[in-house]
Amino acid sequence: MLCKNICAMSTYSESFERRVEDTLCGATVREQAAEEERLMKKPPTGDPAHDVLGYEKRSLDAIFRATSVAVIGATDEASSVGRTVMRNLINNPFGGTVYPVNPNRPSVSGIKAYPSVSELPEPVDLAVVVTPAPTVPGIMRECAEAGVQGAIVISAGFKEAGEEGVDLERQVLEEARRGRIRVVGPNCLGVMSPKSGLNATFAGAMAKPGNVGFLSQSGALCTAI
């Protein structure tokens, strides 16, 4: 599923996630998501008051409830998107694990970097992609092979850049569908979940936790609000 040019900020709730899917995905993807939920639902334990194992995993959990994130294109270069995204993830109260992925650097922000997603020490829930547009289809294929379930493609240079970009975006969508990866982007600000401390954006500040979920087609408007 490809959600084009979306910035999302949420305190995260199941009802919000369902509204996101209803708004962005369309009937075909909703049907696919319903089937995924049916397959992933664990049998109840028999005690509704303590039915922890009865939780239904939803297809957007990999984004809004991510516990591990790979930043593909993370770097220490000043004023770069890769540096800002990395800093936003590690400087906010996100309780998960963050892995920088960059084949040209041994470490980023003092954290060991890995050459590729396939070489990470564990599968990750979410990949945040900030590499040049021509590299993204291959990265999406690699993410699918590594079992990544959610991706945020911040990279620009797709449909908005002309015919070549249209073809690149089509390739990204094909790889995402093949790997059953939920995608926000490309050419987007990213996703914030203030309640969980996840700031997978290049925005200058983290939103405060609250009771409102916010989606914007415009990254500038999202940042301003």
Segments (PLM) and residue ranges:
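Catalytic-core regions of core metabolic enzymes
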Residues: 35-225
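Residue-identity detector for glycine
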Residues: 20, 26-27
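Charged/polar low-complexity intrinsically disordered segments
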Residues: 4, 21, 32-36
